[in-house]
Regions:
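Amphipathic alpha-helical assembly/interaction segments
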Residues: 1-120
Length: 120
């Protein structure tokens, strides 16, 4: 049931979500906490949650559907981070760190998708 917990992709996505949640809750302006802040939190949550849901599915097609949704949500996170930097809600150093975190999730997630595709 909890097959996702051993996956590096999920572990890193879970860590990324916590960072994004704290950043959006603590650093974004009050007016943005319910706009961009909410969006980045939801997208970050979706990355990890879709891995969980995908790994709970029985068919490879369903697993791939949710893993692909996770990958798309990760792209959304990357764009939200870009917007946060453009609006000066985060520093350049924070931006670079978050982009690196996104890449740390992307690499094992794409490997997981490729491996799942090969089993089907």
């Amino acid at each position: 049931m909890l097959r996702h917990q051993n996956l590096i992709a999920w572990q890193r996505a879970d860590d990324l979500f916590v960072k994004l949640h704290r950043l959006a809750s603590e650093r974004f302006p009050a007016a943005e906490r319910f706009e961009l802040g909410s969006q980045v939190r939801r997208a970050g949550y979706s990355v990890a949650a879709n891995i969980v849901e995908g790994m709970a599915r029985r068919s490879v097609a369903q697993q791939l559907h949710f893993l692909n949704m996770s990958e798309a949500s990760l792209a959304e996170v990357a764009y939200c981070v870009h917007v946060a930097r453009r609006l000066n809600y985060i520093t350049q150093a924070e931006y670079i760190e978050l982009v690196a975190e996104v890449q740390r999730v992307f690499a094992p997630l794409t490997c997981l998708i490729r491996r799942t595709r090969q089993t089907g």
